[in-house]
From Swiss-Prot:
Organism listed in the record: Pseudomonas savastanoi pv. phaseolicola (strain 1448A / Race 6)
Name of one Pfam family that matches: HSP33
Protein name: 33 kDa chaperonin
InterPro entries the record matches: Heat_shock_Hsp33, Heat_shock_Hsp33_C, Heat_shock_Hsp33_N, Hsp33_helix_hairpin_bin_dom_sf
Keywords: Chaperone, Cytoplasm, Disulfide bond, Redox-active center, Zinc
Localization of this protein: Cytoplasm
Sections of the chain in a coiled coil: none
Length: 300
């Protein structure tokens, strides 16, 4: 039995007799914290939870030091879904929506018709990478799986579920041939594991622990489950970042903004709703090189 982090974690597993690895993710507290920042309609909250689960799974598969960003855009009721997950497994997310266009049973294609999905890896060192694919699957799981098909990488499949309280995800990925080198046997092995994964119901994914899920799916296959890695919600906004945005405007424009906004500038974080206030004294201190050590006001 593995000691698990409280509610939010990823957990890797591998098949001993085939070239396939997997990753499971469970999100509760971080999902709740994201939803607490914005009163999303249920279909939007579900989509955002699925995208959060996907980002956490992807960070588990990539070896990098930096930030992974998943961004879905459309001209429909949900013009934007965006999730960021750092290599330290710190997660945040946001959605934009038009509530008048959302029905209770709306799915991905109802909410985001003709959409696109961008995956960006922004390392602290090295070159930024971005790939874009049409959001043409029946759900986010299929759309993300299609992304990896289009990018001609190793076979990768996603299963994502969220219900407004918890978000769960399963990723399966082919590894380079080692255990099985015959191409036909390799294809059959891959088809075997994804066919079994596709029998997993939403109720099972959202309600069962990882060991039970793996036993139900693969009790005839030798599978090794590794230690869990914790995930948490954390927003990267700060008063310092907001101050840097003001400095980039230049002194004259920053002072003019203070005047236009009745003596203080409010900078709101779109992710967590943190609000940073800067008055004329703060602005003068910034441009005099005094830094941001003495905030006039910062509030939620």
């Amino acid at each position: 039995m593995h000691d698990l982090p409280d509610t939010d974690f990823t957990q890797r597993f591998i098949f001993d007799e085939s070239d396939v690895r997997g990753e499971l993710v469970a999100l509760e507290r971080s999902y709740a914290e994201v939803l607490a920042k914005h009163p999303y309609p249920e279909p939007v909250a579900q989509l955002l939870g699925e995208l959060m689960a996907a980002a956490a799974l992807l960070v588990g598969t990539l070896k990098f030091d930096g930030l992974l960003i998943l961004q879905a855009r459309s001209s429909g009721a949900v013009p934007l879904l965006m999730v960021e997950c750092s290599s330290e497994r710190e997660l945040r997310g946001i959605a934009r929506y038009d509530e008048t266009l959302i029905t209770p049973d709306a799915g991905l294609q109802d909410l985001m018709p003709d959409g696109s999905l961008a995956l960006t890896v922004d390392p602290h060192k090295g070159k930024r990478y971005q790939g874009i694919v049409a959001l043409d699957g029946v759900d986010l799981s299929e759309s993300l799986s299609n992304y990896f098909v289009m990018s001609e990488q190793l076979g990768t499949r996603f299963w994502l579920k969220a219900d407004g309280h918890r978000a769960r995800g399963l990723l399966l990925q082919q590894l380079p041939a080692a255990q099985i080198t015959d191409p036909e046997e390799r294809d059959a092995s891959w088809e075997h594991v994804i066919t079994l994964a596709s029998t997993l119901t939403a109720e099972e994914m959202l309600g069962l622990d990882n060991q039970t899920i793996l036993h139900r799916l693969y009790h005839e296959d030798p599978v090794r489950l590794f230690d869990a890695q914790p995930i948490c919600f954390r927003c990267s906004c700060s008063r310092e970042r907001s101050a840097n945005a003001l400095v980039s405007l230049g002194l004259e424009d920053a002072q003019q903004l203070v005047i236009e906004h009745n003596g203080s500038i409010e900078i709101d974080c779109q992710f967590c709703n943190e609000r940073y206030l800067f008055d004329a004294t703060d602005v003068a201190q910034l441009f005099a090189g005094g830094g941001v050590d003495s905030p006039s006001d910062t509030r939620h």
